């Protein structure tokens, strides 16, 4: 095995360079052709059953509205019943002919089973699962009073998503359906002051990349990597810590529209805003430069706002 490893160490670097110079242009051309083809074959979601977690606000709420405009049937999941009722009514007004709400907590495995069971009981099928539920917290890792305080971030962001995905898979196989995972740009790029959050999103990214291979070709998986979006989850943290929402952010409605377009085209990855894709590439090609830039941003602009007790 050591000999094989040595051979790979010697061969892969030059072969990779040869591939990049000789074959990568053809790869990009194929990608362009496939992109044009996807734009011509947008998925018709009318009367398709879509379950959305974290649907009471933010990206989940606005993605629900985009589906509603196209006539999809919706199962809306979140903890806040009052907010779900408002989103459901708005979705009906926008064009959804059938909307149900299922209050509950994605970090509770029994609730996740209930979400799927009630959706199937009401609609008889499931076509799209939009895994959007998540929580965000800005804190220096060493400033956790009790390290256990970080558990809810992983419980909701990672385990909550895997629980409901597990129960949804048999039904999505029947419908040849789709899973959409709303992760974060922090899954690929370090996010100072949100280490546990970034770790939870990185775990989701690798989980769904692996699951995509396991479930292919029966179930398609789209992974979304948004940047900072102006939502109820992120904006209060910026105001509390920095006095204003100064971080470069995108409106939630614009982000949701881009996500919906990407889902309809059958994209495997959706980076929104699109410039983040190039930041991810730079991180892979010259990681030290990206790390230096993030460190400068953190030390110069962010860290001074955090006063240690």
UniProtKB/Swiss-Prot annotation:
Q: Which PROSITE patterns match?
A: ADH_SHORT (PS00061)
Where in the cell is the protein located? Membrane
| Keywords assigned | Lipid biosynthesis, Lipid metabolism, Membrane, NADP, Oxidoreductase, Signal-anchor, Steroid biosynthesis, Transmembrane, Transmembrane helix
Q: Transmembrane residues, as ranges?
A: 10-30
SUPFAM superfamilies per record: NAD(P)-binding Rossmann-fold domains
**PANTHER family per record:** 11-BETA-HYDROXYSTEROID DEHYDROGENASE-LIKE 2-RELATED, RETINOL DEHYDROGENASE-RELATED
Q: Which family does it belong to?
A: Belongs to the short-chain dehydrogenases/reductases (SDR) family.
Write down what this protein is called: 11-beta-hydroxysteroid dehydrogenase-like 3
Biological source species = Arabidopsis thaliana (Mouse-ear cress)
